[in-house]
A protein has these predicted regions:
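Short, functionally important structural connectors and interaction interfaces within domains
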Residues: 65, 75-77, 85, 148
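Terminal amphipathic alpha-helical/low-complexity segments used for targeting or macromolecular assembly
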Residues: 1-75, 141
Length: 156
């Protein structure tokens, strides 16, 4: 087995193994994306308070509070429960889109391109959409079935 210091590592592994960074800074870098205590506090409070609530009350509360995390959210967007968000400030969601339960929206990466979800898009339950340095653009009226994975290191 290769020495971990010599072995090539991806950006996530480099961030996690960096002994110079605190656990807080690693977490902010991997999940929140934007630096600063206000961004961290806002992200943590909204996720902690509203991500797990089922039913109509949860849908209503997420509709009000989740848009504060994103780059832009259109009208009539529905957020299911237990959605995982990474770097939500790089995510744009168009009008009348539906993000089902247990979806992962990951716009992590060095560049600021991120994830664009158009109008009237449905993202099915347990789907992972991940931009690892690339970007993903889902045009209007796209329907992604349940349990799918879309991963990009360039452009989809």
């Amino acid at each position: 087995m290769k020495d971990p210091e010599i072995q090539e590592k991806g950006s996530v592994q480099k961030a996690l193994m960096d002994k110079k960074e605190s656990a807080y800074k690693k977490y902010v870098s991997l999940f929140v994306g934007k630096k600063g205590i206000w961004q961290f506090f806002k992200y943590e409070c909204i996720i902690l308070l509203f991500s797990w609530i089922p039913g109509a009350i949860g849908l209503f509360l997420r509709k009000i509070f989740y848009p504060f995390l994103f780059r832009n959210v259109g009208r009539g967007v529905v957020f299911g429960h237990h959605i995982t968000l990474r770097h939500p400030h790089k995510i744009t969601i168009g009008d009348n889109s539906f993000i089902d339960d247990y979806v992962v929206l990951d716009a992590k990466g060095e560049e600021d391109r991120g994830l664009f979800i158009g109008d009237n898009v449905i993202v099915g339950r347990n789907t992972i959409i991940s931009c690892k340095g690339g970007s993903i653009h889902l045009d209007d009226f796209v329907n992604i079935s349940a349990n799918c994975s879309l991963l990009s290191e360039s452009l989809i």
